[in-house]
Amino acid sequence: MSERDTALEKYKSYLLQHREWDSKLKDLRFGNRDLVKKYDKTEDDIKSLQSVGQIIGEVLKQLDSERFIVKASSGPRYVVGCRNNVDQSHLVQGVRVSLDMTTLTIMRILPREVDPLVYNMSIEDPGDISFAGVGGLNEQIRELREVIELPLKNPELFLRVGIKPPKGVLLYGPPGTGKTLLARAVAASLGVNFLKVVSSAIVDKYIGESARIIREMFGYAKEHEPCVIFMDEIDAIGGRRFSEGTSADREIQRTLMELLNQMDGFDYLGQTKIIMATNRPDTLDPALLRPGRLDRKIEIPLPNEVGRMEILKIHLEKVSKQGEIDYEALVKLTDGTNGADLRNVVTEAGFIAIKEDRDYVIQSDLMSAARKVADLKKLEGTIDYQKL
């Protein structure tokens, strides 16, 4: 072998070694990067274990570009500085901050305090409901979407015409006609934040607590816009005010006054809307019903023949059936019933099928169930619902 060939072979072997060491170096660099990450994480964990807790305070006033007056959670007020990495433009009156234990320097900005009751309202899931699953209320759905959906999705339409969009809507009518179902359909179709409020749960035995929950509820809604607040059974706190009464009645009246104040404080083109529901509209306070607070009142009546047929078809859609179903006969037999009664008819028909050891429903099951529900309706009292 010539000297040239020997040198060439050596060059090739060195080149292969170089590539091999180069790939090993890359692997080591990647391993080193992972080790550095683990080291930094361990350092942070050690610091967090060794670090001292911080005091929670509230900003009262900014004195100059570097100093703030802060009220600590324990009560006293201090003039303090601020860390360089804290955005001072967010340090306005009322903002919660954490303070260093020794120097009382503002360390970070904290989110606003949320009452657990309000937080539980916000995690209420409206469910997988669409307007297609609400039968016999086409006109009411149109009116509700005009008030709630249109201002949230197309506020420029109202600016163009020069009118102010409504703030809220009242749904009233007999029990079981679909008031809560409509509100859930609105929340599910819009995909916005949704606060489900049971009005009776707001009332607290301690003076001022109910009004505080109302304030926190509206404050949370404004911070998480767009938001829809649904207040069910509003007659629990929205009843007509009177001069006599116990201390509990006066507390409910204070709660109502706070609610009226919060509704008046809305920005018209704000992204917070209210839906209220009741089956006793005659007991509500006139101040709550006036335009500017509840601009539109939508009556949810008992379904007519067309509505009852739509509701029955919706409830029977996923039910195993055999033979032809005579919907017209069912509709005539269920005169004066509401949507909840019609759902009960389908459930009772299912029970009859189970008793007879069948896995499907037939026409006679539905007719028997409709007669049973009609007999039970005679036990219920009636209220004459006047248009508001």
From Swiss-Prot:
Top-level taxon: Eukaryota
Family annotation (InterPro entries): 26S_Proteasome_ATPase (IPR050221), AAA+_ATPase (IPR003593), AAA_lid_3 (IPR041569), ATPase_AAA_core (IPR003959), ATPase_AAA_CS (IPR003960), NA-bd_OB-fold (IPR012340), P-loop_NTPase (IPR027417), Prot_ATP_ID_OB_2nd (IPR032501)
GO-annotated biological processes: ERAD pathway; positive regulation of RNA polymerase II transcription preinitiation complex assembly; proteasome-mediated ubiquitin-dependent protein catabolic process
GO molecular function, one term: ATP binding
Keyword ATP-binding attached: yes
Protein residues bound to ATP: 173-180
GO CC field: cytosol; nucleus; proteasome regulatory particle, base subcomplex
Coiled-coil regions listed: none
Alphabetized UniProt keyword annotations: ATP-binding, Nucleotide-binding, Proteasome
Function, as annotated: The 26S proteasome is involved in the ATP-dependent degradation of ubiquitinated proteins. The regulatory (or ATPase) complex confers ATP dependency and substrate specificity to the 26S complex.
Family (UniProt): Belongs to the AAA ATPase family.
Name listed for the protein in its UniProt record: Probable 26S proteasome subunit rpt4
